[in-house]
Amino acid sequence: MKKIFFAAALAGAAMLASCGGNKSGVQMGSLSDFDSLSYSLGANIGYGMSYEMKDIPFDFKLVDKGIKEGAMGKASQEHDKSLDMLREYFMSKRGERAQAIAEKRAAADSVRLAGGDSTKVEYPAADPEMFESEEERAEISYAFGNDIGYNVAQSGMPIQLVWISEAMQNVRDNNAKMTEDEVNQYLQYYFMVKRPAENAEASK
């Protein structure tokens, strides 16, 4: 099944929100009652990150903080500033640092082989050197979360933030309550069936 990555999902949600006039549906929520939409969205974000950003050692506590504060309109950083930071990092710094790390590892492997050591070294997927400092790691992690939170709020969906956080953590821990296919199926149902029906009813 074709994957629905979170950026596309949120873009679709924002378009539907503009049609239906629902601009505010975000709340912190409670883990006492499972929320399929919020969990699916969080798992979708988590799965997307595990594929496309596994090389980046985010501070996930700050990502989570950014999501919640951004979604509730309480971010300590303007969304435009977060976007500028993310563009610079992902369009320039990320690629340069990934290349430098790959070259460094290749050189280390060559030295070992030259010394007669053929043992294969398993390098971590996310290298700390993807960030130049802990300060930059914190800034990018928060900005990334703030961008997600901002777009969640703009989507107008009835989202419980605790379930987004829970799902993202579950995906990282490899114990998600929904498989990737189940997540995709639910989001397709929500965007193509449930949400349009709700918007049509609201516009009467």
Regions found by a protein language model. Name each.
Residues M1-I4:
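Positively charged n-region of N-terminal signal peptides that target proteins for export
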Residues M15-S18:
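C-terminal motif of bacterial Sec signal peptides marking the signal peptidase cleavage site
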Residues S30-G73:
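Post-signal-peptide N-terminal segment of Sec-exported extracytoplasmic proteins
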Residues K61-L113, W163-K204:
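Compact alpha-helical subdomains of small soluble proteins
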Residues L113-R137, A143, Y150, Q154, ...:
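Extended amphipathic alpha-helical interaction segments
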